[in-house]
Amino acid sequence: MHSLAPLDYAIIIGYLGLSLIMGVLMTRRASSGLDHYFLGGRTLPWYLLGVAGMANWFDLTGTMLITSFLYMLGPRGYFIEFRGGAVLILAFMLVYTGKWHRRSGCMTGAEWTIYRFGESKVSEVVRVLGAAMTILTAVMMLAYLIRGASLFLGMFFPWPPLYTTLVLVTVTTLYTMSSGFYGVVLTDLVQGIIVIASCLVIAFLAWNMIPDTASLAATALQVTGNPNWTNSHPEWHTPMPAGYEAYSPLIMMMSFYFVRHFIGGLGTGGEARYFGARSDRDCGLQSLQQGVMIMFRWPLMIGFAIMGIYLVHSLYPDPVILQRAADLIHTYSPQTTAAFWHDLTSSIINAPAKYPPELIGQLQALLGPDWQGKLPLVGFQGTVNPEQILPAVLMNMVPTGLKGMLVVAMFAAMMSCKNGMVNGASAFFVKDVYQNLFRPKAANRELIFASYASTLGIVIVGFYFGVAATSINNLWGWIIMSLMAGQLAPGVLRLYWWRCNAWGCIGGTVLGGIGAVLQRSLYPQMPETTQFLFMTVLSFVGTIGGSLLTQPTPMPVLKHFYRTTRPFGWWRPLRQEFQGAERAAVDRENRSDMIAVPFTLLWQITLFLLPMQLVIKSYQAFFCTLPLFLIGVTGMYFFWWRPLMRREAGTATAT
């Protein structure tokens, strides 16, 4: 059995210990008030908020999942991640949705609901429903992270993956409970430095392994069966292994995911880092920084995919061995499901004495004396488990010391994403459920303890669902295409349509949320495209129908929202709120923002693609993509950056 060296373990233990110490040191400052605990007192500079935003997208499970698609498809796997991993919604936050939400002065998205719809019993229901759906989404996202962590940790530690994951989750939960948003941002800064350094190291190691693009393409063809592995442009149809056939019509799936996130991006911006920003400029700058920092993730993942190609080629020159190994394990353990396949193989590897000697002997004869190092890559269906490529590369192809640092980097990615997510969900529970419904006059100390309890509860429930998940890809697809799609309409329409009211948001949230949960319970194998279409229609029908069948939001509330947020869209009854030069300035800002969005999307898409083309030494494709990147940068400068700086200069002069 491969295992980490003592130096690697020392690095990992030292990192986790340092994280706990930092959390304890931040406790006093974070506990001075809810504003400090959840938003850092609204005093954190944009570059620290940008690091925190980057960490929310740089998670361990997502990195493993995207690496699996890049392993199967090469750079074209990037286009499948238009469903989430490419962070297309960031373009909308960068240009305008982040600053729209900051202008409210609220602490959470549910609190923002009162700002948008006014003080009423119906608005309170919307606020609580919004908090409930946010907490549910956080729980399922946490389950997704925990499932990925168990796959990762089972490769490195001689204990059941469930227990090692529990230890890591416990450490990160204690840290999040004690340090609040200050600690989230502080560790995100440290972890961001570790992760980016690791990205550069892995990208260089992979680049150095490739003799040339043609040689890589030939090896990839032998390993994956994909004849166009080094291509960067999507195709109408591409071969996919068993279990992933739904992604074969690549252009159709890419287009579908793009439309889904274009719609979803219209309703973004309600994250804590935007509520906590000091100005409109800081909202844009932190988003820009997030995009640049997330870019480093892609050479890391294509690097792992390349090294995985060479690793599988050396370990399994004959793919038939994989099928025979899986069949052998199924024979001795026919009751094992896909959800617990990894736990079974990890147990066989770490405790072979617990299993029949005949099974161990046949595995050794089939896989060779190093059978324990090869078995983790054997998937449930008798093919390479692509979700295990990343930990397999770390275990087999990275030297001691550096291996420990890279494992720490993956821990850091998981901790950063989990900490920010749990902190945000806890804020919703304490502010919008506990204090709002049960203890409106609760003292600060009581509310801080309520945040501790809610953090613990969210983690426990997320851990339970994570253990039961069959696949990180399956769970991620449901979260994005069903659960979140069922909440699209209330989030979008309330920003752009004056007639959208609290009843409409209730209708859209309830119909979409119930639909997503029922779909997962009754039809878990429903295709992602069908999930999205069905839940989106339910959400829009509920929101539009509920709004039109009830009274509109009181005009004074709408006027206050419109005047402070200054949105574009269907706001004709409110346009008279701005007159003359002020009206012209608002229209000019909105027009620039709308034009800037497609340029920002072009910039972001090409920004992530360019470094992957460099790593695989596809220089011709790189120089074809570069002009598109420069067009995006130019458009952003003229339609986003220059107008933003002019407005900031005008505000400074006026004050």
Segments from the language model and where they lie:
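Membrane-embedded helix-loop-helix hairpins and adjacent transmembrane boundary segments
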Residues: 1-655
